[in-house]
Amino acid sequence: MGKYLEKVFRLSQYGTNLKTEMIAGITTFVTMAYVLATVPNMLGNAGLNKSAVMTAVILLIVITTCAMAFYTNRPFALAPGLGSTGIVVSMITNEGISPEKAAGVIFLSGILFIAISFLGLREAVVKVIPVSLKHAVSAGIGLFIALLGAKSCGLIAASEKKNCLTFGDLRSPEVILCLIEFCLMLLVKIKNIPGGIILSILITTIAGIPLGVTKLPDRIISFPGKMDDIFLNIDIKGALNTAYIPFLIALFIPDFFSTFGTVLGVGAKAGYLDEKGNLPGIEKCFQVDAVSTSVGALFGIPSMTTYLESSAGVEAGGKTGLTVIFTGICFLLMLFFSPIVLMIPTAATAPVLIYIGIHMLGAMKNIDYSDMTEYMPAFLCIGFTIFANNIANGICIAIPVYVLMKLISGKVKEIQPVMYIVTAICILYFITLI
């Protein structure tokens, strides 16, 4: 077994081992397990069979994540995107589009992804993105992850009175537990304790029981629901209606840029990027991501995408695809033991996201602050990822501004021709938001 794992995942080449990869894989699983509570609930509220959706989500995560592991040897885990899930729910509940046609739109989005990914167009776009913007994407994702963690535990909350973000209830048990675990994480990192992230999550989960933060499940074992109601329940012909083009664009463009941003961000965290900010073998990651979206549509599940929480496994020492093989195994067990993992409170996973997000801000030091045409678009990328609460929004604002500033400053030669096409796509994306 050891020789097989070494041959497939090249553990010694990446300076890792089976134990480290296992701990990292479990860490990734714990930080993204919330998807099992959110996606089935969201689609269930839209009229889909919640039990069937839960089974489909688990199986898709396992299959697509393991495909990523074996095909790319990268520690990237996939799951249904919450943004695309929200769009699909809106299509069904607000626009009156049937779940079958919504699945058809998702499928067409995936086919479009497959076409541009296997033709190498997606990789070409990434290569022409300026180095400063690539580093800005990594930093922006870091802030996005940190804010996501802070909001999930209630440390940061939206104030209706002030119409802005502010501190939540600092006296709440969730916030107190979150802050204590964050300090605990700093301690285990300073002391370099193996498995420190998992240990801190476990301690916080147990500590949350007497405080009422950790809700004990009423049962331990669950059984997978049948997928008869959703499998191949798809209307591709009906989805070809031109009226659905805005929804196709709304699914396609954000996922395109979010995936590119996530892969580069997590890749930077893992030390995979070359001196130009490119990720070797990124086309394989895109290909898996693209095929996964179309496969997911066959189950009525929104766009499968690479998850930011993969960075938690990287922080725990994960270097290869073996990391997410263990993530996949953990999710597979959830077909029968989902109540156990769903008891882990957000107060236990939020500090992990905050810690990782802070670490990813290190990418900002690589931005050229002596050239306004470089640092201004980079700032907008980082800022609007947070201000507009979306990775794609930050990227789609930064690219047109970069091109415009280079044109105004007379630095036309620094603009790759493909950047004009990418700029047009970004503008098209914002038109769909109007």
Positions of the model-derived regions?
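Helix-loop-helix hairpins and the membrane-proximal interhelical loops
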Residues: 1-53, 164-167, 201-283, 426-428
